[in-house]
Amino acid sequence: MNKKETRHQLIRSLISETTIHTQQELQERLQKNGITITQATLSRDMKELNLVKVTSGNDTHYEALAISQTRWEHRLRFYMEDALVMLKIVQHQIILKTLPGLAQSFGSILDAMQIPEIVATVCGDDTCLIVCEDNEQAKACYETLSHYTPPFFFSNK
């Protein structure tokens, strides 16, 4: 994991396990865990993690706002229409080829959707390797992903 991923994981953990009232409080807790960052970086991280301030009674604190499954599906369909180059099964894996620079976005969306057949995604710049448990799981996953492709995608095959 890189520094940002490690920091994000710690922030998610702190938000879910403790009540954090302010950005300064979160920044101090990060520092106690050996991570020193600026307020601007923390603010960007909080936005990327969909952290929102909520009020319950007289208390305000931060929580992670979950993105709905429907929204992730819409996002996947949008990416498939605009950036999918190839979708192919290779034994218990699926190769998803994208326009340059977009494979990690596909991987993040697929991870967030928690498709049961997907064991892991490994993404580079323009290729996302989707690993499934076995060949049957890969076929089922391929069928699921095919529903998000534009109608014309498989017309030449």
From Swiss-Prot:
A single GO cellular-component term on record: cytoplasm
GO MF annotation terms: arginine binding; DNA binding; DNA-binding transcription factor activity
Keyword Glycoprotein on entry: no
Location relative to the cell: Cytoplasm
Annotated metabolic or biological route of this protein: Amino-acid biosynthesis; L-arginine biosynthesis [regulation]
PANTHER family the UniProt entry points to: ARGININE REPRESSOR (PTHR34471:SF1)
Function: Regulates arginine biosynthesis genes.
Protein's recorded name: Arginine repressor
Source organism of the structure: Streptococcus pyogenes serotype M49 (strain NZ131)
